[in-house]
From Swiss-Prot:
ATP binds at residues 10-18. It comes from Streptococcus agalactiae serotype V (strain ATCC BAA-611 / 2603 V/R). Coiled coil: none annotated. This is Cytidylate kinase. It comes from the Bacteria. The keyword Transferase applies. The gene is cmk.
Length: 227
């Protein structure tokens, strides 16, 4: 069966990762968490007290401790930097609040985008992020751009943090998400925007199952046409 690449983009907490993981499982595709890769770079920078001007040092750390993905017993994805598992460490608030400046560094983006493209060259990949359809996989057969209100996204992040035991305040999350939106859409390198040929879908008030069904039906139609 011919496979395709699927790009799912959108702002913070628009449901990209949750949906991408489910669809990957349903289609037996590989889910590549690009956001986790930028979080890994951010985690390394924070661990060593590096700032934007220390780009060569951050790249050096990424070379010393390559990013890889594994699977936990329950099937969920695990993330490693070298031999250290950082699945939960990269989801802490200090990483979340610093990932924008790290991911805006052109050399960091270039290195991680090259890694992502290498992984996707054989197809059957689902990637989510902010510039997958525009920069990383411009030739992806299906491009989706998810949006949702700031309130809805803050609510999702709040529940997610509660489940992971991460302390957070709802109003603070709202302001952090709004600030992240602004940074992501105004940065010089790969700003957050929908690809011209992307299908935009507002997930406000839509269940996860509803979003999955919408995207999967589109994917299956394209796969059928290729076979």
């Amino acid at each position: 069966m011919n496979s395709i690449n699927i790009a799912i983009d959108g702002p913070a907490s628009s449901g990209k990762s949750t949906v991408a993981k489910i669809i990957a499982k349903n289609l037996n595709y590989t889910y590549l968490d690009t956001g986790a890769m930028y979080r890994c770079a951010t985690y390394l920078a924070l661990q060593h007290g590096y700032e934007a001007q220390d780009v060569s040092k951050i790249l050096g750390l990424l070379a010393e401790r390559p990013i890889s993905f594994g699977k936990a017993e329950d099937g969920s994805q695990t993330v490693f930097l070298g031999t250290e598992e950082v699945t939960l460490a990269i989801r802490q608030n200090d990483v979340t609040n610093n990932v924008s400046w790290v991911s805006a560094i052109p050399e960091i983006r270039e290195e991680l985008v090259n890694q992502q493209r290498r992984i996707a060259k054989d197809g059957a990949i689902i990637m989510d992020g902010r510039d997958i359809g525009t920069v990383v996989l411009p030739d992806a057969e299906l491009k989706i751009f998810l949006v949702a209100s700031v309130d809805e996204r803050a609510e999702r992040r709040f529940k997610e943090n509660q489940e992971k035991g991460i302390e957070s305040d709802f109003e603070t999350l709202k302001s952090e998400i709004a600030a992240r939106d602004y940074k992501d859409s105004h940065r010089e390198v790969s700003p957050l925007k929908a690809a011209e040929d992307a299908i935009e879908f507002d997930t406000t008030g839509v269940s996860i199952e509803g979003v999955v069904t919408f995207i999967q039906e589109k994917a299956e139609k394209i796969i059928d046409m290729k076979n």
